[in-house]
């Protein structure tokens, strides 16, 4: 029998008694966001909405985005990445397990030098794929042009956020490139490998 999302007590300022809210709701109130599934429209919209709300609530207080994401849809992922750049608060990104495909794209979007990977984390980068497998030739042609534009944008972001030369990014996005946490740090995808818990805690104060 599934356990479901645990509930925890929470007392809002001014309330005498605590109410029970689900775990993620409680964590969101502490500006701790979680991307722990494939990126789709629903999860991207939820996270973007939370980022806008938290930015309006306190533009000077950091947001922490914990990532364990195997990939997902390109357009919602690009939208989430752009929202991270648009809001005022710094967004710290923390890779807890895997950041693959669009998950790695969100990981690089964190505020530098506040992109963290846990020691066991794994990162994978590759190019965005088309969503058309069937359909008319016109659909395929239009989608191909769109994918090319998105690929160019993603390539530019990887170049800017990692410091790698364009030829390196172009080459690596043409295949699946897997990295350990330390390899991702050397590549420029993350800034810190939190091998020492004190390093990790410093970012979560």
Swiss-Prot record:
A Pfam family it matches: CLP_protease
GO molecular-function terms, A-Z: ATP-dependent peptidase activity; ATPase binding; serine-type endopeptidase activity
Keywords, alphabetical: Chloroplast, Hydrolase, Plastid, Protease, Serine protease
PROSITE patterns documented for this protein: CLP_PROTEASE_HIS, CLP_PROTEASE_SER
Catalytic center residues: 101 (nucleophile), 126
Alphabetical GO biological process terms: protein quality control for misfolded or incompletely synthesized proteins
Encoding gene, per UniProt annotation: clpP
InterPro entries: ClpP, ClpP/crotonase-like_dom_sf, ClpP/TepA, ClpP_His_AS, ClpP_Ser_AS
Protein's UniProt keywords contain Glycoprotein: no
HAMAP family: ClpP
Catalytic reaction equation(s): Hydrolysis of proteins to small peptides in the presence of ATP and magnesium. alpha-casein is the usual test substrate. In the absence of ATP, only oligopeptides shorter than five residues are hydrolyzed (such as succinyl-Leu-Tyr-|-NHMec, and Leu-Tyr-Leu-|-Tyr-Trp, in which cleavage of the -Tyr-|-Leu- and -Tyr-|-Trp bonds also occurs)
Name of the protein this chain belongs to: ATP-dependent Clp protease proteolytic subunit
UniProt record similarity statement: Belongs to the peptidase S14 family.
Task performed by this protein: Cleaves peptides in various proteins in a process that requires ATP hydrolysis. Has a chymotrypsin-like activity. Plays a major role in the degradation of misfolded proteins.
UniProt signal peptide: none
């Amino acid at each position: 029998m599934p356990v479901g999302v645990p509930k925890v007590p929470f007392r809002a300022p001014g309330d005498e008694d605590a109410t029970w809210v689900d775990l993620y709701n409680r964590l969101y109130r502490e500006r701790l966001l979680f991307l722990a599934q494939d990126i789709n429209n629903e999860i991207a919209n939820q996270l973007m909405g939370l980022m806008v709300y938290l930015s309006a609530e306190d533009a000077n207080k950091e947001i922490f985005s914990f990532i364990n994401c195997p990939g997902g849809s390109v357009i919602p992922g690009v939208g989430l990445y752009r929202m991270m750049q648009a809001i005022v608060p710094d967004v710290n990104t923390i890779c807890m397990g895997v950041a693959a495909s669009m998950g790695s794209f969100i990981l690089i979007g964190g505020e530098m030098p506040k992109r963290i990977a846990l020691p066991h984390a794994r990162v994978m980068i590759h190019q965005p794929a088309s969503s058309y497998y069937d359909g008319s030739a016109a659909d395929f042609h239009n989608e191909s042009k769109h994918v090319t534009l998105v690929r160019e944008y993603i390539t530019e972001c990887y170049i800017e956020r990692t410091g790698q030369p364009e030829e390196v990014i172009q080459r690596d996005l043409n295949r699946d490139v897997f990295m350990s946490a330390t390899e991702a740090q050397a590549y420029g995808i993350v800034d810190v490998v939190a091998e020492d818990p004190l390093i990790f805690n410093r970012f979560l104060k």
